[in-house]
Design a protein with these regions (language model features):
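Acidic, surface-exposed loops and disordered segments
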Residues: 1-173
């Protein structure tokens, strides 16, 4: 059985090479809206999405993330847009709620022909003094957990086909 949604799920791949041009506002808005419709525990919508497209903030996040990773390379792979997903630290299912947002963002991006990738280390970034200062600068108050970065852009290369699924992925009892 298949439909457009299932086909997008099957074909989405992490993109690690991007064209330098910025995505359109319409594409960004569509991806963001999809993120806001992610399931959340008790419908509380505990996540928050921060859009980063300016060069200075993008460079700061890249530097912070690379430091946590212990590398000099660009962990954001040159993507022109970074969506930082945060979750309310006091919510019962904060990380799960934020993770569902990340999934919706990436699937929506794929449905529009955009590349995306989940970049880790957001928790370490926003646990740091520099990360907390960024949140304050952005007007975000309270206790927040960095769930992930969803990087977005136009893929520089076509995605490779999916690897076969492992035979023991599903266990029916």
């Amino acid at each position: 059985m298949t439909n457009e949604t299932l086909q997008t799920i099957r074909s989405r791949r992490s993109c690690r090479a991007y064209e330098p041009r910025q995505i359109t506002d319409a594409e960004l808005d569509a991806v963001l809206e999809a993120g806001t419709y992610a399931a959340s525990a008790m419908g509380r919508q505990s996540a928050k999405i921060v859009v980063v497209q300016d060069a200075a903030t993008r460079a700061q996040l890249t530097r912070m993330n690379a430091a946590v990773m212990g590398t000099d390379s660009d962990p954001m792979y040159g993507a022109p847009t970074i969506l930082v997903v945060l979750a309310d630290a006091h919510a019962n299912c904060a990380v799960q709620d934020g993770s569902l947002v990340m999934g919706n963002l990436m699937l929506a991006a794929a449905s529009l022909g955009l590349g995306s990738c989940w970049i880790n280390r957001a928790r370490e970034e926003f646990d740091s003094a520099e990360g907390k200062a960024l949140l304050k600068k952005w007007g975000i108050e309270g206790d927040w957990i960095g769930v992930g970065h969803c990087i977005l852009g136009y893929p520089a290369t076509a995605p490779k086909p999916a690897a076969p699924r492992k035979p023991d992925y599903i266990v029916r009892v």
